Structure formats: C-alpha cells, structure tokens
Amino acid sequence: MAEEGNQEFTSKMENSSDSASTSPDAPQPSENPPSPPTSPAAPQTSENPPSPPTSPAVPQTRENPPSPPTSPAAPQPRENPPSPPTSPAAPQPRENPPSPPTSPAAPQPRENPPSPHSNSSGKQPLSGTPKERLKKARSSSHSFCSVVKRMKVENDENNETLSEPGESSKEENCSKAQESLKNKDSEPGEKSSEEKNTCESKSSDTGSSNALPKESENAIIREKLKQEKIRLIRQVEEKEDLLRRLKLVKMYRIKNDVTELENLIKKWRKCGQRLLCELQSIMSEDEDEKLTLTELIDFYGIDDNLLHYNRSEEEFTGV
C-alpha cells in the first residue's frame, strides 16, 4: 500500500508540474504542499515525506528520495525529478546556462576565430583582394613621394648648375632692356615737353588777345550797374517820401474831419485875399501910382491857385 501511495504522489506531482509550465496564470503552490492521498485501509509507512522546494527559482534536492517500486507492473520513476511550479514573474531556468559576465575590456569569443593576418586593433579581417589593393596603394604612395623628392632635389641641383654660367648673360640682357626702356621713356617725354611749350605759347597769345575785349566789356557792365543802382536809389527815396506824406494825410484825416479842414482852408484863403487888398490900398497911398494885385502876388511869390486869383480880370474868385 505504501508503494501505491508513493506512485500516486509522484504521478500527481508530474501532472502539477506540467500544468504549471503550460499555464502561467495557475496559482502557486504553498510552501508546505498537502500530503499525498492514501487509502483509508492502508497505513502510512513513511514518517518523513519528501518536502517540496521552498524557493521558486532554485530547486532543492530531496534528502530521502522515494524507493523505486519492486513490482514489475509499477511505472519506474524518471531520472530527473519533476521541476517545481514557478511563478510567472520568476525567470525560468534555461537549457543552456548563461555565460559568465565578462569585463568590458576583455574580448568576447567570436564564432569565427581571428585570422593571423588581422590587426591587433580589433579591425575586421580583410579579404585577399582588398589587402593587395592596400599594399599596392601604400607602395605607390611611398614611391610617388620619393619620386617627387628626387625630382625636387634634381631640379634644385640643375638650377644651381645652370644659374652659375648664365648669370652674366641674364644681367647683360636686363641692363640692355632697362636702357632701351629709358630711351623710349625719354623720347616721348621730350616730345611731350615740346608740345606743352608750343601749346602754352599759343594759349598765352590767344589769352592776351582775348583779355582786352573781356576787360572792356567788364568795365562797361560795371558802369551800367552803377547807373542802375543810382536810379533805383532815387526811386526808393521818392517812394519813401510819398509814403510819408500819405501817412501824414491819413493821420490828419483820422484825427480831423474833412469838412472842418475845408472850412479852415476857406478861412485862410479869405484872410490872404484881405491882406493883399489892404497892402494894395496902403502902398498906393504912399506912392502916387496905384499898385495892382498881380504885382503884389509876384512880389511875395504867392501861388494864384491857392488864393483863387484870376490874372486876366485881376480879381479874386469865390469872394
């Protein structure tokens, strides 16, 4: 009976492990799983049943593994013990164990081993054709530099050797060219100086001939301007005098009435006529001959229009 109970327990454990691995949402088993069911008539022989693993991540081995069945009909237990149910959050153990952590500086092992021709700096290995191209390019660049340097050195040496015998000829050619240039420069300079002198002489002659009429014209213009200035000054003075008189008349008219002024003028005229008549009578008494009014008016220089005197009739009008 004990053997049958152990077989049932192992089969249940296998079923529970399969269900836990297939369904992640299955409830986690408790730390102390229930004891396997036994028949009511069969007494339990094993006092210490095998305890399940406590941690979900690390499986614990049993201290007392169950004894294998002796009967030929009983199924034999598996070599690997059933894995305990794990939580969905806990990482399941992988078939291949994880590689140990390596330092960042340590080179990781590669699937393809590095070839012996690869560089120590960690560059990818190149195939045969690129390597040959690089070698050719390097050799060509080195050879080009060396050729250029040799050419420079050879050119410098050739220039030094050629410059020594040809220096005198070059100096002679330069001196001849400078002399020819000086001669060419001096010839047009002389021609230009002669042309300048002739132009200056012609301009002086024409300038002297043109200066005389210009001076006479300027003198005439100055005289005309002076006369015009005098005429304008006189006109300005006359206008100012007329303006002054008009201002006086305006002032008198504003202060006095015109009718009053006319009456005053009439009174003054009558007084003047009376005075002339009295003088005529007095002077005629002193002298034997009688003096006329025209003689008195001419003697005193009085205007006939002011006194309203008529010379033809020798009488005052408007008396």
UniProtKB/Swiss-Prot annotation:
Composition bias type Pro residues, residue spans: 26-40, 65-116
Record's GO cellular component terms: nucleus; Swi5-Sfr1 complex
Keywords noted in UniProt: Coiled coil, DNA damage, DNA repair, Nucleus, Phosphoprotein, Transcription, Transcription regulation
Locations listed in the record: Nucleus
InterPro entries: SFR1, SFR1/Mei5
Ranges annotated as biased composition (Polar residues): 117-127
Biological-process GO terms, alphabetical: double-strand break repair via homologous recombination; positive regulation of DNA-templated transcription
GO terms of molecular function: transcription coactivator activity
Composition skew (Basic and acidic residues), residue ranges: 167-203
PTM sites of type Phosphoserine: 67, 71, 83, 87, 99, 103, 140, 143
Extent of Low complexity compositional bias: 16-25
Residue stretches in coiled coil: 220-270
Transmembrane segments: none
Annotated segments matching region Disordered: 1-215
Pfam families assigned: Mei5
Family per similarity comment: Belongs to the SFR1/MEI5 family.
Subunit description: Component of the SWI5-SFR1 complex. Interacts with RAD51; the interaction is weak.
Function of the molecule: Component of the SWI5-SFR1 complex, a complex required for double-strand break repair via homologous recombination. Acts as a transcriptional modulator for ESR1.
Protein name per its UniProtKB record: Swi5-dependent recombination DNA repair protein 1 homolog
Organism from which the protein derives: Mus musculus
Classification of source organism: Eukaryota, Metazoa, Chordata, Craniata, Vertebrata
